Structures are given as C-alpha cells and as structure tokens.
C-alpha cells in the first residue's frame, strides 16, 4: 500500500517551541555520546530531521491484533526541512487512524467515502512500492511534511489485522525500519489468548532484502535487548535496543522485521468458540487426522525470461517437493512457454522410479519462447478432470494445481478476463489453483485472481530472496490436506449474519475462522454443527456452546477513538467480525463480473468500512484540522497506548472497563467532588469526615507568593504549589487587596519525574515529552501513570497512579471588574494515595481529626455541622485540632463556582493555631520547589504582625 501524503506546513509545533527544541537537542546530544565514534560522523552528515522516538505497540486479543506506530521528529537545522514517515504494514491489515502533529494543530485522519477528486485524500492503492526495503506480504505507508526550523512533529498510525495460522503457528511481524538510529526505540507486543498459549518464540530480525540488515547467517534466538514475560494466557514481549545495539544491527536504522510467533491450546472437537456482547468468533483447526490423498499438477514457466537463477532455484525447490509426496498421491509435471510440454498424458502414482524420472524431466526443460498461461492451465485442469472421471476413487482426494510463472501472458489467449473465465469454467469448483509469482515483472493481479476464484492461495517470491526456500515454505502450507468440503452451520434464528461457512479444503497447520453477529443477546447457548469429508468417511461434529453475556476476565473491550460513533464500546470480536466481513465483500467484488452486483458489494463494503473506520479500496482518508476538540487526545499523545480509532485497549487482565470522561459535565464523572479545597481569594475548606466537621479559613498572602498546598514529596512523590496574583480590593471593602491563584504546579517524582503547570489559559504537561494544551478545548491525555482531563473553560482533572485525584477549577471573566482576575481553584478529590506524613496548607489535614470541645448553647445541633444557623454573628466555639484549641465561628461558604454550599467552622485569625507553624513556613522559593513544607517538631507561636482580618 503506497499512501503518500504531502503537507508543506510552516507552523510552530507548540508555544515555546524554541525552548522545547533546545531540550530535545539536549536529549539528542546524550544519544550521540552513546554512539561509537565511527558513527558520529555519519550522524553529523545527515540533513534530514532527527527521529527522537520510534515506538510500536501491538495488542493481540484472540488472534486479532491492534497495532499503533508513534514517531516523533525534530528539525535541528536553521532552515525548514521535509520529514518523511514510512511504515511497512501487513498486506492484510486495515489502517484505522492516522494523525499528524505540527504547530498547535492536530491533523486527524477521517475515514470517508472515496472521493477521487479530493486532493487531500489518502488513498488505499494496494500497490507495492519498488523500495529496497519492501518485503513480501507487506504494503508501504508514507507521509511527509515540512518541519519548521528548530521545531518538531509527530506521526501516529494505527492498523488492525487478523493473524493467520500457517504451519501450526501464528506470526505477528512488525517492521522496524526508522531509516536512522533512534534515541528511544521501543517495540511492545502484548498477547492475550484465553484458551492458553502453548508456545512462544521471538525470531531473529528478518531483513533479507536490505543491505544494512543485521541478521547474520546462523542468527538464532531473539534480537538483543528483547524481554519476554509469559504466563498461561498472557505474554508481553518488549524490544528496546539502545543506540549502540541498533548500530551493531544496522547503521542505517533499517533493523528489519521483529517477528513474534506463537500457538494456542485448542480443543480436538468443534474448535474454540468465543461469544461477547452479541458477536461470536469460531476458530476451527482440527489435528491428528489422516491426510487426504492429493492429485497435484506442477505447472512450471519455462519461457525465455526464466533463464538463469530463477529456473535453477525453482527446479531445486520442486525436487524437494517431489521427495515429500506421499505414496497415496498422484502427480504430473507441465512445462510451458509458447508451447505446452507435458511430461505424461495422465497422472502418475508416487513411486521411487516416477519421482526420479520426474526430476530428470524437469532438468531437461530449457527456457525459450513466450508465455501461454491459458494453455498451460487448461492442460493441467484437463489432466485432473480426466483422472477423477476415469478412476473409481474409493478414497476422497483433493485436486491441486501449483502454478509458477515470472511474467505476463504473451502467447495464445492474452486477455486476462478471458483467461479467468476459461479457468473458472474448466475447474467447476473442483480444483484449487495455488499460484506463485516470481520476480517483479509478474502479473500478480492475474495470479491473485486465479487463486481467489479457484479456492487457492497466491504468493510473491523475489528472485534474490532465496526463491527456492520460499517456494518450499509455500508448499509446506498445503502439503497435508486433512478435510474437504467443510460446512459449518449455526441456527438461523440465533445468528443474523456469519462470514463464510463453506470451505473446499482444510490443510494441516492452518485455521478456519468464522465470525458472526447474533440476532438476540438473550439466549443460553449457540448450536454449532460441522460436516466435512476425511479420506473414506464423512465427519459430523455437533456441540451446544453456553453463552454468558458478561465481562469475562480474559475479554477486553476496545473503545473507539472517535466521537462520531457516539462513544459506544466495540469489543474485539465485533471488530474481528467487521474485518472479516469487509474482506469477504472485497473478495466477492473482485470476483464478480456483474456491474450491478459489484456496485451492491461495493456499497456494503463501504458502509461497513465507514462504520468501523477501516481504510479500504472503497474508502479514503482525509486529514482535517479540527483543533484539540475530542476527549481522546491520549490516542494521539499517549505513547504507551494503542492509539487511534478502535485501538484504546483497556486493562488486559481486569474484567471491568473504566468509563470515559463525559465532557458535557463540568467535571470528570469518575471524580467525586471533595469539600477539601482552596478557591477564590483564597478561601480554604477542610473536610473532617470522621467528625462530620468542616473547617474553613483564609490566607491573606502577597502577590507573587507561592504557597505549598500539598507536600508529600518523600512518600507518594507528589507536591502541589500555588502562585498568587494580586488585584485591587472592591470599593468599600475591608481589605486593601485581593489575591488569587494564577498558577497551580503539580510535581510528581514517582515512578518517573513529571510535572503539570496549570494556568487559566493552558496546561503544560512534561512527562518526558513536553506538551502544551489550551484550556478552551476539551482533551484527555495520559503519560506515565498520569491522566489529565481538560473540560473546556471549566476545569482540569488530574489523576495520578489511579489513587490520587485533583480538580482545578477555571474562573474566567468576559468583562472583569478592576478587582477581578482570571484565576484557579484547587480541590482534592481523592487522597488515598497520599501518605500519612503528607503536609502543606491542605495536605496536613487529610489524615487528621477535629473535635468541638466547647460551644455556646445557641449552636444546638450545629455540633454535627448539619443545621442552618439561627442568626449571623454567633459567639465563638472551640475546635480542638492536633491538641491545639482554636477559636472558630459557624459560617456558610459556597464552593465549586457556587454550585455547592458548605457549613463550616471558620478560623478568623488567618489560620493561626489551626495550621502547623505560620504562614511563612508554607512559602516555596519557586513553583518547582519540592522541599518539605515544614521542618518543625513542635508548633510555633502564631505570628502577631500578620493581619487577622476576616474575609468572606
């Protein structure tokens, strides 16, 4: 697939990009220090942008793989430079999302109906490139843009595929070809198979067609720096080579294919059937059955273009294949150019003499003349039809043609449509044709359609890629047919739609996969019936599968990354069903010769692809610049998450799925709003839930003061500082000035250091990569156990490691009065992760208790802090906190933008005696100061020179 996207944009990537670029420079210089001296000159000579990070994350759930590629680039040059992102993806995969970051904009790929006139469309051409690094069975995705000087850009690509079982194993291949050495290179593969993982191996890097390949002859075992963790149903594989390790593999950054191969535990009988939320998948792969006899004709191109290594390697491969034929098989050999050279006029049994004579015949075939593909196929089909018609075959057998060519039809019938129709008419659905295209000049589309229409498979073999070995490998996939005429039935009153259920053959080591959509979710079981032929008998298998509609521990829900689908949850089985259905519609469309039928198939495939965000030949991808509007920005920035539509995979080991933020509300619905907060000028509220008491106080600070609100740096690693801004006091007020929080800084040093700097207009998140988010657009981002949810112009919710949560309220004024300032409020929503030693103006009360020890009779039931006051100006009560007696009065105070009202005991004395120490003890030297908030072993006396004014 060649997907070429060119954007010449000259926007700054983020605000303060010069400073960020310098920080990236520092990182890249550290990378250079780790590179061997002989490689430094090579890096200096590069004129293309530096790739700072290349990350691939694959999550495989019951053979269905979600893969996301993330790439970050930096232009260190003094002029604009073009950056190209390219990624080989499996030929069978569907792209589901592509996103680019440049300037302050996020360019998201939107799957739309195919519009040939649109110049912005990214088309699914399904054409292979001529690039040197193109591998068999893969397509190339390319995108390019111009990065301004000293700026950076990022690319994010997501795709999905169903892994096919070949030779008894599933193989997941990831292209690791960043084209340069990368400071941070990571490949991570998670495998979840509820039936159990029986074998798992990581192969050496495979890159046979590239000069820079690090795969040496005799390489065995996984690549260096590969880590494998596995239990019965789950496996995690991580490949994280250093720059030095990359250089030893390939100095040009073309490392090759990272391949994970595995198999699963399977039932001997009906197969593995999984049901989830109205959809099912059926994996059928029987074993330990006697093989069916084969009737096979080898058809070999001996035209002039096959001279040399191609013909020699093909002969050697066929010698190996002939040696592998079983005694019950029948075979023949045809060589063709512009003449059809048939070894014998009938099929021969497999005997030592016949095998020897067949080899001799092959070696006497000499290349000459043109290419009569139609004539060769008709001769082979006639041999097989005659054998079946003339022999009373007791054993059921499978008729196969293995057809090898390196070119296009040049002699006899050359019209491809006529060749296809002639072949289909002659085979009558009874003969399977397996085609092999050798070299780059072959008419691969013709071979592909020949196999597609005649129950076969096709392979492309590059002549410089050990063609003989590839041919033998292809034959190994079909050498052992176990069943024929397979039919799998499900009750029509239960299953609304199922993918293909009729299969001509089943070969040992492969797998039949059927997915279906059920009529109704309210039933207890799914009846499955399999009928097939095996040698001398029919095989009938029946079973009722219990259906439990629940969130199973080994099932994983997948959440689309687009608001267009209304936020509905799509499970992996539903996506597998849609994937197979689209594939089958495309296959039927290619085979159809009726324009009306083709249009109907095209429309069905297009509608399904649009619904599930698949890039197909009937859909296109348009890049839109909507700004940061959706609540799925973690799909763009989250390097460790599977990103893009339909690839945000939830916790692989837990059954529950966390709800997503509802941006229509003014706060994250997962977060319960707490009374413990500081807001306004600044008004502090502290909740003591055990005592059913709420205490409030004011701090009259100075503009520029930085207050320590939460200090738990040595334990949980969290510190929160707030910087004050000044404003004139309102007319006739009792205060000389007001102060508000203009900046809240949250610092985290576990598990890795990161910080958040929040103002009413923006959020700066530095979790390894610096990210600037505007507060006027709703987004959700995640990094290193930190989740930040911005609800536009309303609030920011910060969740740390799942057990600490803060809500920062945004106060904005359209037409502010002189005494008003845009400012922030800070609320502690979840403090479970903070330690008992937590301190700060708010933090010191989180694990404390308070008690009213003396109050006048006028308060009555107000000791429980529930009733309303009888009147204002009530006398003082005494509150006991940490052994200190604090005079307080009862008051009502509004919090959370006036949406809630709390009854609290108010300390009028600027928190004297209530807090440990005095106000100055809570002043930080700068916003990123993490020193202990208070170094006192005993309380100090309150300051006497601070104003003790009450402000409400």
Swiss-Prot record:
Glycosylation sites per record: 97, 127, 136, 231, 508, 776, 795, 862
Record's GO cellular component terms: collagen-containing extracellular matrix; extracellular region
Listed GO MF terms: serine-type endopeptidase inhibitor activity
One GO BP annotation of this record: uterus development
Keywords noted in UniProt: Glycoprotein, Protease inhibitor, Secreted, Serine protease inhibitor, Signal
Primary location recorded for the protein, binned into one broad class: secreted
InterPro entries named among the record's database cross-references: ITI_HC_C, ITIH, VIT, VWF_A, vWFA_dom_sf
Cell membrane among keywords: no
VIT domain mapped to chain residues: 35-161
Domain VWFA: 295-478
Signal peptide: 1-17
Known function: May act as a tumor suppressor.
Family according to the record: Belongs to the ITIH family.
Designated name of the protein: Inter-alpha-trypsin inhibitor heavy chain H5
Gene name of the encoded protein: Itih5
